[in-house]
Structures are given as structure tokens and as C-alpha cells.
């Protein structure tokens, strides 16, 4: 051997702490928020993360001499203090691209977060952000269609799209489920939706639901003259079953299907995305289980990382929270990962939680979906925050209308069109929200009743996971 092999244990920072390293354009960069055990130096903690998420092990091994370890290792090249947090720090790590299989989000996450989170030297660890190099992005399939293709397919332009989740989300028979879909779509919504946990239960088998939903869509299209859709959830316990459900939706002439991408897994999601592009189907993505992973401010994976990974894995729509509704998410953070879903280039901006410049090249964008505890009074804020390339989904805010789901849908449609008209006329939606909505309600009894019904409903809880610059 040309090099001497010295058996034993040495500190991680001797190999993986490289403050003089300048990251390459082809490197995959990651920012971790680290909280080490008491007495362990920051450099050792950060280097341990770099080692355990790349080539390292706890002991020197002879087989290191069989490869160029210095080429393949992850390198911690910078450490920063976390604003307002004396215990934690940011570790910036560069990984050579050859560590990862081309186009495999599964492989990237297995490396970066697969084992290191159980490391004893750490009290907490959170993956805050990833900068994917263009060479990796070009190897990924991405959204099966993208924003423009979806608008063309649905023939809907110049405004956010409207949707709602069918309620109650569990317990309805297939026929009654289809009836609720029909009421919502004829009332003015663009989409209705299966909830994340409706698959194929004893009270409603999936074939039965798909058939009645297809009938509801066709009837509502005939009545309204508009293209309609329903997110048919094809998530299943096996890939074979998932594709069987997707094929049946295609046979029924449905424009869009749905997948729970975290519980279903990135491998299944990427495969389904490829199938959708090949078969001309839109793909709606639900983020069920995300808060288990992303809500703790010191441990887990930030949702901006999951959003980036989803854009690479594939999906045309992704739930992002609402800012104003019942679910977690402050305004600036939400805007940050909405940018990651839709824009072709997102600059580093710590005020929005983006730690790196991210160039998406020509990869299509993803519709941001606002869903969870929203109603007509929220419409001006939602249009302001999310813009046109979004889907605004009102579940209880549709079905809870005193006159029923069709009236709730009509109220939402009138409120949306009033806000878009006011915005296009140069009015300030959030400052003039009450005037805009009450003016529209003079010509819509459905909206007037909705405004009265939900005038006192607010979700004013403090956000648990705040941007560190706010702390």
C-alpha cells in the first residue's frame, strides 16, 4: 500500500472540518441546525454530521486506502450561530455529487438524514435547507405537467383555482360521496378532493368511489360548461394496487389523481409522477405526516426541504398550509417555500428561510395549495399571499354553509372573483378586504350568509416553528 494504515479512533474534525473549502457548483449543499451534547465542540459536532451523512464511520478502517476518501467525503465548510439560540448553530456541509444516485431523492435523503439523526453526540438535529446543483436537477423527472400545462388542460386562467375536500372525509358511501362532489362542482368550484386517509375502506371501496365521482364530474361539466376535476387518491398498500387505481381513473376520463407522498414514499411518488406524464394525468400531492417531521424547530426536516424534494420527485400541486387558517406556518416561511415550488430561480433570503441560491433551470413549477381552516373572510389575504398560481381549498368553508355545499361553493367563487377584480383594479386586498367582500355580497345572497356565518371564526395561535431571524 502507498499509504500507511493507522488503526484506531480519531476525532471527526481532523478529517471532515474544512473551513478553507470553497464549495463547487456541482456540490450538493446542506444546512443543518445542530444542538450538540454539553462539552462537545461545535467543530466536532458539525464534522460528525458531515462524516455520518457521507463516508465516515466511528473508527479508522483499512479499506479507506482502497478509494480516494478525500474526494468522496462530505465537508463542513462553515459554522454560524443561530439568532436567538445560544445552544444551537448552523453547520454548512458540501457533498460531492458522485455520492448520490442520479435522479434519486430517496438516495439523497437516505444519505443526509438516514442515520445521523440518531448520533449520540447530538441532542437535536434539523435539516434546514438543501442546495441541489443543476447537474442533479437535470437528472430528476420533476412535475409531470407543471403550472402552464395544468391551466391549459383545465382551461382556467387569470386567477387562483378553487377546491374543497369532501366532508365528512370518512364514512360516506360511494353514492353519497359522489352527490357531495356534484353539489360542490355545480356551485362553482374547479376541483373537489379525496382527503388523505380515504383509500379503500369497508364503507367505500375505491372502485365505487371513482365511478360515482366520475358521474358527478360529467354532470357538473354539462351544467356549468366548465372543466371540472376531483383528486382521486390512488395511494395504496402496494405499488401494483396504486397503478391499478391510477389506470382506472384514466379509463374513466378523469383529469387528475392524488398521492400522499410522505406516507406513500418518494420511490412510489417518483414512479407515479412518471406514469402521469406518460398518460396525460395531473398529479395532486398531499403532505400527510409532514408535521411529524418538520414542526419541531430544532429536530427533523424543514418543510422547505420536503417541498424542494417533491418538486424534483414530481407533482403538479402540493399542500403548503395557509398562513391564515388552522395549520402551522408563518407568512414569510410559507412564501419562502412557495417560491421554491414555483420560481425558476430563488435567491438566498434568510428573511424567508432560504439559506442558498437555488437555480431550478427549466423545471416546471408546482401549484401551491392552501388548505386547512379557511373561509370567505380569508379570501383577500389568500389571494395576496398565494397569487394566481395556487389552489385555494375550502372544506368546512364550503360544506359548513347553512344552505349546503353548492351555496358554499358559490360564495367562495363570488368572493374569489371579487378579490381578483379588485386586485386587477389596483385596490389593496388586505386593507380593503371588508369593503370588497361586503360589496360583492350585495349581489350574492350565498356570500352574504357565508360572511355572517364565519365572521367570528379565527385561528389566532402563535406559530411554533418560527424563522430564527424572528426569534
Curated annotation (Swiss-Prot):
Active site: 167, 286
EC code(s) of this entry: 4.1.1.39
Pfam families linked to this entry: RuBisCO_large, RuBisCO_large_N
Binding site for Mg(2+): 193, 195-196
Any one cellular-component term (Gene Ontology): carboxysome
Quaternary structure note: Heterohexadecamer of 8 large chains and 8 small chains.
Designated name of the protein: Ribulose bisphosphate carboxylase large chain
Species: Synechococcus sp. (strain CC9605)
